[in-house]
């Protein structure tokens, strides 16, 4: 399906995620895409696209957690949580970094999600430091933290290995731009 979004700007699509509806993040705003009704399929003749916010997204994959989508804003310094709000009967995207703006000040290059044993959104900053956001929306828990492992990782690729059946550990693998990898295992008790 090729469809032109009625908008006053032409922007590249940065991410697509599925929560309550299909969410499109562009460089200029965030949109919901549906089939026009509850549980209706999107077809060439049955499509409804609504703009939800004007923040704009960076070219970093968004993360769907439950009914929310966490995405990096265009300047790569703010993590936003796009979620449906019954009070406004639409989606809102509050700034998740508002109480810890210093932690993402240098910008983020990527994000990934760890579901077990704790729900954490991991990110690599532009200066190479590893940061995390402990995130449990249903409990209203958001806590930022930095992790310094005795070095900086620059343009690292971060992979969080999810051990759903092993409650006592999480392994983080960082792959540097030159291809070398460093593995960290964190045991929880």
For the regions a language model picked out, list residue spans one by one.
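Conserved, well-structured core segments that form or line functional sites
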Residues: 120-123
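Beta-propeller and closely related beta-pinwheel folds
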Residues: 1-118, 133-152
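Acidic surface patches and DE-rich sequence motifs
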Residues: 26, 125, 176
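Polar low-complexity, Ser/Thr/Gly/Ala/Asp/Asn-rich disordered segments used for subunit assembly
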Residues: 153-189
């Amino acid at each position: 399906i090729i469809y032109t979004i009625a908008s006053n700007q032409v922007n590249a699509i940065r991410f697509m995620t599925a929560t309550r509806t299909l969410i499109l993040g562009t460089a200029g705003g965030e949109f919901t895409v549906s089939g026009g009704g509850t549980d209706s399929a999107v077809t060439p003749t049955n499509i409804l696209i609504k703009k939800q916010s004007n923040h704009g997204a960076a070219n970093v994959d968004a993360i769907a957690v439950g009914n929310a989508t966490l995405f990096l804003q265009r300047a790569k310094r703010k993590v936003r949580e796009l979620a449906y709000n019954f009070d406004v009967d639409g989606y809102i995207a509050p700034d998740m970094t508002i109480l810890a703006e210093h932690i993402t000040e240098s910008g983020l290059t990527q994000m990934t999600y760890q579901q077990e044993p704790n729900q954490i959104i991991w990110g690599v900053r532009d200066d190479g430091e590893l940061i995390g956001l402990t995130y449990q929306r249903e409990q209203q828990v958001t806590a930022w933290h930095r992790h310094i492992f005795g070095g900086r990782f620059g343009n690292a690729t971060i992979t969080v290995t999810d051990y759903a059946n092993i409650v006592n550990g999480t392994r983080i693998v960082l792959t540097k731009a030159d291809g070398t990898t460093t593995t960290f295992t964190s045991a929880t008790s």
